C-alpha cells in the first residue's frame, strides 16, 4: 500500500521529472539538455555566482528561435505544474490545521468571539451581515480555458495521490494519467489565438459558481451552525449571509461587444444552470424522504400545499400518486421538480419566484420536525434551502455598468429632439431638469426611437429599454444594480435614475427596480464624495428611489484607477478617509451604506488578503453589508479548488462577523488625531513624488520601452480594449495593463513607489501641501518619530495592512531583472528613471523593516517564502523576454515565444494585474 504522507517537495520533484521525460519525448534530448543548462545556470546566479547571469543571457540569446520557444514553453509548463503542487500543499495544511484545531480565522474563532456578546447582539450581527463577492471579466487571466481544464484534471490526480490506501498499481495508474495530461498540455496551444468574447467570459464565471461554490456555500453554513451552537446558549437563526454577483456579460464600460443580446443570453443560461442544479438536489432529496404516509402525519399545512400543487398540475399529480402512492414527501418533491421545469415556460404551474420554492422547502422541513426528523432536516433539507436562498433563480445577479459620459451623451441627444440643449446646462440646472422629469408622470423621451442617435447613444437607450423586459422575464433580483464609472457629479447618478424611469424600471414613489451605484475612482470624486452623496440624499426624486430600495445606498470605490492616479500610499489613504466621510453622510441621512470595493488581484489594484482588508476598514463604515470584486486569475486561485474556495469563504465570513461586532462595540475606532495628521502628511508627499514621476518628460516613453506593454495589449486576455480611447497615455491606459506590465518586468512599481518619500517627509517634518497652515511643502523644526510609526503599525489595522501589502509587493520586486528591461530603453531615459526608482526602492526596504520592527521583509507571506525557489525558474523567461523585446523585427515564431514568456512569468509570479 502507498500509505506514506506526500509533501510538496516530493510533488515538485516528481512533476519536474515527469515534465523532463515529456520534454525528451515531445521535443528532443538536446532540447531537454538546453533547458537543464539554463536551469542550472539560473540557480548558480541566484546562489551568488554573479558571472552566471552573463552566461544565462548568452545561452538564451544563442539559441535558435525554435529552441527559444521550447525553453519558454518548458519553464511555463513547469510553473503551471508547480502551482498545482503548491495548491495541494495549501489543502494539506488546511486539513492538518483544522484537524489539530489550529486553523486561524476559522468560524470557530469567530463564534468564540461572538459568544462574548448577548444573544440579541449575536442575532443582530448575523442579520446585518451580507457578503457579496462579485465576479468580473477583467482581463487578468492569462490562461486559456482549455489549459485550465487540463490543469484541473492534473489537480484531481494529485489529490488522489494523497489517499492513504492506494495500491502500488493504483498509484502507478494515477501517474500514467498525469503523464498523459502533461503530454496533452505540452501539445496544446498555450496562448489564445483570438480575443475571448463576452459569452466566453460569462461561461468562465458560471463554471466556478456551478462547480465549486454551489456546494461550498452549504458546507460553510453547516460549519457556522455547529460553531454557533457550541458557543451561544440559545437558538440562533442563521439568515442568508452570501449573495454572488457577476459583471461578466453585463459590464459595458469600454466594451462595445457587451450587447443586450449578450446580457439576455447570460441571464437565460444562468437561470437554466441553477434550475437544473435544484432539480438534481430535489431528486436526491426524494431518495431520502421515503417516509410512509400511514406511519407519519405530514400535517394539515403540508397536505394543503400538496393539494394546491395537485390542482396546478393534475397530470403530473396523477403520475406522482401512481408512482408514490403512500409517500407524500416524494409526491411533493416530484411536483416541485415539475414546477421548476416550468419556470419561464409558457406552460402554467411553474414557480413565480424563488420565495415560492423556499416556502415549499420550509413546509417540508416543518412537517419533518413535527414528526421527530430534525436530523433529516439539518442534514438534507436545510442545505438545499440555503443554496436556494443564496443563488435564487439567477445563479448570480448581474450588475450593469457603463461610463457616465455615455449616459450624458445619450440624454443630450435624446433631449435635443425636444429642443433642450442639455450640454449647455450647469450642474444645478441638470439636477433640476432630471429631478422634475423623474417626478412627473409622463415620459420625456422614447427609448425605442434611436434612428437619429449616435451608435453609442442608441446602445444606451436600447439597454434601458431591454432592462424592463429582463426584470419581467427573470425577476428584478436577477439584474438589479447599475454601476456608473467615473462618477464625479450628482447629475451622473440622476441620469441613470432618469433613464430607468423612462424605461418603467422605476415608478416613484412606490417602486424602484434598481440600485444605482456611483463608482468613485478619481481623487476629485473621492474628495467630493460628501458633496455628491449629500446632494443626492436631499434630492426629492432620489430620496424616493432610495426609500423604495429599503434606504440602502451602495457606493463603489475604485482602487485600481485611484492607485494609478495617485500612487499606492496616497490612494490607500484617500480611500480610507473618504470611506469614513461616506459613513458619516449616510448616518446623517439615516441611510444604510453598503461599500462596494473594486479591488483587483494585485496589491497595486487593491488586492491582498481579503480577511485582513475587511478587518482594517474604519469601524464607522462596517454596516455588515460588503461587496467586492473578484477578478481574473484571482478567481481561479481562490475558487478553482473546492477546499481552498471553502477556506476563502470561511475567512471572509470570519472577518466580517468580527468586524461587525467590533463596529457595534466601538462605533468609532481608537485612532489618535496625530496618527491621522501623520498619514495626511505622508500621503500628500507620496502623491507629489508619484505624480512628479509620472508627469516627468519622457516617462511614458520609458514605460513603453522598459516594459512589455505593447505585447500585453495584443495578448487577447479579455474582450475589451486595453485603453479607453485607444491612446497611449498613463491617464487613459486601463489599470490592468499598467500593473501587468510593471509586474512582468519585475519592477512592480505601482505596488510600492513613493511610500518611502511619504514616510521620509513625515520623519523630516515636511508640512503637507493640503495643510491650511502651509502654502507649499515646508519643513517644520520638529520632525516625526519612527517610534510613533511603529506604534501606528502595532495598533492601527489600516496602517499595518497598508505597510504589509507594500512589503508583499517589495518582496516580489527584483530590480536586477528590472534593470535588464531598463537597459532596453533610451540610455538617457534609463539613467533618469531607473536610478530614481532604485533609490526609492532601497529606501522603502529600510523603512518597511524599521517600522515593522522585523529582520525579513515579508516572512509571513507563504508565497514570499517560496520566491527563492521560484526565481531561478522565472529568470530565464525574463531574460528571454528582454532579448525578444530588443528585436526591432521579430519573426512569427519569435512573436509567439514572446507572448508565451508573458504567460510563463505570470504563472511564475502567480500574478498578472
Where are these regions (language model features)?
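Beta-sheet entry/capping signal
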Residues: 239-241, 245-247, 255, 385-386, ...
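Catalytic or ion-translocation cores adjacent to nucleophile or general acid/base/metal-coordination motifs
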Residues: 258-289, 502-688, 889
Amino acid at each position: 500500500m502507498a500509505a506514506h504522507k506526500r509533501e510538496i517537495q516530493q510533488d515538485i520533484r516528481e512533476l519536474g521529472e515527469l515534465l523532463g521525460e515529456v520534454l525528451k519525448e515531445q521535443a528532443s534530448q538536446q532540447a531537454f539538455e538546453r533547458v537543464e543548462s539554463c536551469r542550472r545556470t539560473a540557480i548558480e546566479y541566484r546562489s551568488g555566482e554573479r558571472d552566471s547571469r552573463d552566461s544565462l543571457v548568452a545561452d538564451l540569446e544563442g539559441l535558435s528561435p525554435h529552441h527559444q520557444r521550447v525553453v519558454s514553453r518548458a519553464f511555463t509548463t513547469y510553473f503551471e505544474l508547480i502551482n498545482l503542487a503548491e495548491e495541494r500543499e495549501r489543502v494539506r495544511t488546511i486539513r492538518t490545521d483544522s484537524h489539530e484545531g489550529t486553523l486561524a480565522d476559522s468560524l470557530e474563532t469567530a463564534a468564540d468571539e461572538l459568544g462574548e456578546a448577548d444573544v440579541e447582539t449575536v442575532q443582530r450581527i448575523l442579520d446585518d451581515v451580507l457578503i457579496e463577492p462579485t465576479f468580473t471579466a477583467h482581463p487578468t487571466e492569462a490562461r486559456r480555458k482549455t489549459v485550465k481544464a487540463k490543469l484541473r484534471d492534473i489537480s484531481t490526480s494529485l489529490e488522489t495521490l494523497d489517499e492513504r490506501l492506494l495500491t502500488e498499481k493504483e498509484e502507478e495508474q494515477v501517474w500514467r494519467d498525469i503523464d498523459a495530461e502533461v503530454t496533452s498540455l505540452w501539445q496544446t496551444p498555450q496562448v489564445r489565438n483570438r480575443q475571448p468574447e463576452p459569452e466566453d467570459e460569462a461561461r468562465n464565471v458560471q463554471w466556478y459558481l456551478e462547480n465549486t461554490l454551489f456546494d461550498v456555500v452549504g458546507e460553510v453554513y453547516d460549519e457556522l451552525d455547529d460553531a454557533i451552537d457550541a458557543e451561544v446558549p440559545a437558538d440562533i437563526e442563521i439568515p442568508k449571509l452570501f449573495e454572488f454577483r457577476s459583471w461578466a456579460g453585463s459590464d459595458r464600460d469600454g466594451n462595445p461587444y457587451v450587447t443586450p443580446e449578450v446580457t439576455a443570453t447570460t441571464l437565460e443560461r444562468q437561470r437554466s444552470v441553477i434550475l437544473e442544479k435544484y432539480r438534481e438536489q430535489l431528486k436526491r432529496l426524494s431518495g431520502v424522504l421515503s417516509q410512509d404516509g400511514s406511519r407519519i402525519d405530514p400535517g394539515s399545512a403540508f397536505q394543503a400545499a400538496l393539494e394546491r400543487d395537485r390542482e396546478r398540475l393534475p397530470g403530473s399529480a396523477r403520475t406522482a400518486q401512481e408512482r408514490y402512492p403512500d409517500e407524500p414527501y416524494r409526491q411533493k418533491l416530484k411536483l416541485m421538480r415539475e414546477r421548476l421545469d416550468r419556470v419561464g415556460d409558457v406552460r402554467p404551474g411553474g414557480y413565480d419566484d424563488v420565495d415560492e420554492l423556499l416556502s415549499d422547502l420550509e413546509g417540508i422541513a416543518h412537517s419533518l420536525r413535527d414528526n421527530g426528523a430534525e436530523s433529516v432536516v439539518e442534514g438534507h433539507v436545510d442545505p438545499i434551502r440555503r443554496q436556494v436562498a443564496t443563488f435564487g433563480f439567477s445563479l448570480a445577479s448581474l450588475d450593469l455598468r457603463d461610463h457616465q459620459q455615455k449616459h450624458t451623451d445619450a440624454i443630450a441627444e435624446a433631449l435635443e429632439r425636444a429642443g433642450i440643449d442639455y450640454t449647455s446646462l450647469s450642474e444645478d440646472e441638470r439636477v433640476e431638469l432630471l429631478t422634475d422629469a423623474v417626478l412627473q408622470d409622463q415620459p420625456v423621451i422614447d427609448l425605442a426611437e434611436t434612428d437619429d442617435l449616435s451608435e453609442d447613444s442608441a446602445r444606451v437607450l436600447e439597454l434601458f429599454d431591454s432592462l424592463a423586459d429582463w426584470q419581467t422575464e427573470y425577476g428584478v433580483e436577477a439584474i438589479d444594480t447599475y454601476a456608473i464609472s467615473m462618477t464625479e457629479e450628482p447629475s451622473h447618478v440622476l441620469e441613470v435614475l432618469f433613464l430607468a424611469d423612462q424605461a418603467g424600471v422605476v415608478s416613484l414613489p412606490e417602486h424602484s427596480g434598481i440600485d444605482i451605484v456611483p463608482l468613485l475612482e478619481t481623487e476629485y470624486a473621492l474628495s467630493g464624495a460628501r458633496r455628491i452623496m449629500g446632494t443626492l440624499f436631499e434630492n426629492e426624486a432620489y430620496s424616493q428611489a432610495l426609500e423604495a430600495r429599503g434606504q440602502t445606498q451602495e457606493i463603489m470605490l475604485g482602487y485600481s484607477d485611484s492607485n494609478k492616479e495617485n500612487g499606492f500610499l496616497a490612494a490607500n489613504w484617500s480611500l480610507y478617509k473618504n470611506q469614513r466621510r461616506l459613513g458619516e453622510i449616510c448616518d446623517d441621512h439615516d441611510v444604510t451604506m453598503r461599500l462596494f470595493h473594486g479591488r483587483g488581484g494585485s496589491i497595486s489594484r487593491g488586492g491582498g488578503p481579503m480577511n485582513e482588508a475587511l478587518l482594517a476598514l474604519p469601524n464607522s463604515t462596517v454596516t455588515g453589508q460588503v461587496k467586492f470584486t473578484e477578478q481574473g486569475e484571482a478567481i481561479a486561485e481562490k475558487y478553482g479548488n473546492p477546499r481552498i474556495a471553502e477556506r476563502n469563504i470561511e475567512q471572509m465570513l470570519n472577518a466580517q462577523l468580527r468586524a461587525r461586532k467590533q463596529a457595534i462595540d466601538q462605533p468609532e475606532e481608537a485612532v489618535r488625531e496625530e496618527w491621522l495628521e501623520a498619514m495626511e502628511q505622508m500621503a500628500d508627499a507620496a502623491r507629489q513624488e508619484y505624480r512628479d514621476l509620472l508627469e516627468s518628460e519622457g516617462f511614458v516613453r520609458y514605460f513603453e520601452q522598459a516594459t512589455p506593454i505593447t505585447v500585453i495589449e495584443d495578448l487577447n486576455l479579455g474582450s475589451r480594449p486595453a485603453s479607453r480611447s485607444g491612446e497611449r497615455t498613463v491617464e487613459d491606459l486601463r489599470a490592468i495593463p499598467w500593473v501587468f506590465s510593471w509586474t512582468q518586468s519585475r519592477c512592480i512599481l505601482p505596488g510600492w513607489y513613493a511610500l518611502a518619500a511619504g514616510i521620509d517627509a513625515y520623519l523630516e517634518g515636511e508640512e503637507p501641501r493640503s495643510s491650511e497652515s502651509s502654502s507649499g511643502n515646508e519643513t517644520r523644526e520638529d520632525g516625526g518619530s519612527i517610534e510613533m510609526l511603529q506604534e501606528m503599525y502595532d495598533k492601527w489595522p489600516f496602517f499595518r495592512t497598508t505597510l504589509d501589502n507594500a512589503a508583499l509587493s517589495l518582496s516580489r520586486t527584483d530590480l536586477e531583472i528590472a534593470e535588464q528591461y531598463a537597459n532596453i530603453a533610451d540610455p538617457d531615459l534609463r539613467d533618469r528613471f531607473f536610478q530614481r526608482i532604485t533609490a526609492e526602492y532601497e529606501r522603502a526596504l529600510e523603512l518597511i523593516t524599521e517600522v515593522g520592527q522585523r529582520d525579513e521583509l515579508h516572512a509571513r507571506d507563504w508565497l514570499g517564502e517560496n520566491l527563492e525557489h521560484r526565481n531561478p525558474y522565472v529568470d530565464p523567461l525574463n531574460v528571454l523576454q528582454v532579448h525578444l523585446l530588443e528585436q526591432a523585427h521579430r519573426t512569427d515564431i519569435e512573436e509567439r515565444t514572446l507572448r508565451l514568456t508573458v504567460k510563463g512569468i505570470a504563472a511564475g509570479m502567480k500574478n498578472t494585474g
